């Protein structure tokens, strides 16, 4: 039996290359991962890693926190998170607002004094109450075309309160997480 060293080394090299390519694609090393904490002006990326066992995909959101300064201490009063949800990748905003809100009234995303997206409360925890608002392409266009954006809600006494939302960086951030 006559073994050609060149043929054997060629076959082994080929197997090594195929194994490396398969390994990189299997572990997604070849694709760029989203960076948790990456900033887009007033928005920050926060990602929840995917789980292969439960077939849960990675979810990344843009977050913006509003703080109130009291006695030289910053206290969070609201958290706005924007991201794409579900298989249809629907754009939604999760609004975490302080406790003491009127739940049945819901929330409103307002742009230039125009109501563009109503939000419905889904749950309340010790951290606050969460409302979810669906944002259409037209709503996003309206939001990004003006600097006067806010989320409105009612307190327990029935008084409407509004909190500002900065859209600075949201377009670049949404392209990044999509």
State what each model feature region is.
Residues 2-14, 18-178:
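A generic "folded-domain core" signal
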């Amino acid at each position: 039996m006559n073994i050609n060293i060149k043929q054997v080394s060629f076959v082994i090299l080929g197997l090594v290359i195929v194994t490396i390519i398969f390994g990189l694609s299997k572990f997604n090393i070849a694709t760029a991962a989203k960076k948790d904490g990456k900033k887009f002006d007033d928005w920050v990326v926060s990602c929840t890693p995917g789980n292969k066992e439960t077939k849960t995909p990675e979810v990344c959101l843009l977050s913006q926190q509003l703080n109130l300064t009291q006695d030289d201490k910053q206290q969070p009063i609201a958290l706005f998170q924007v991201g794409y949800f579900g298989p249809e990748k629907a754009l939604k905003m999760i609004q975490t607002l302080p406790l003491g809100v009127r739940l049945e009234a819901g929330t409103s995303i307002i742009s230039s004094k125009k109501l563009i997206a109503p939000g419905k409360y889904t749950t309340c925890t010790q951290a606050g109450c969460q409302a979810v608002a669906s944002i259409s392409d037209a709503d996003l266009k309206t939001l990004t075309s003006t600097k006067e954006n806010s989320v409105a809600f009612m307190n327990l006494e029935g008084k409407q309160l509004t909190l500002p939302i900065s859209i600075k960086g949201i377009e670049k951030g949404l392209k990044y997480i999509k």
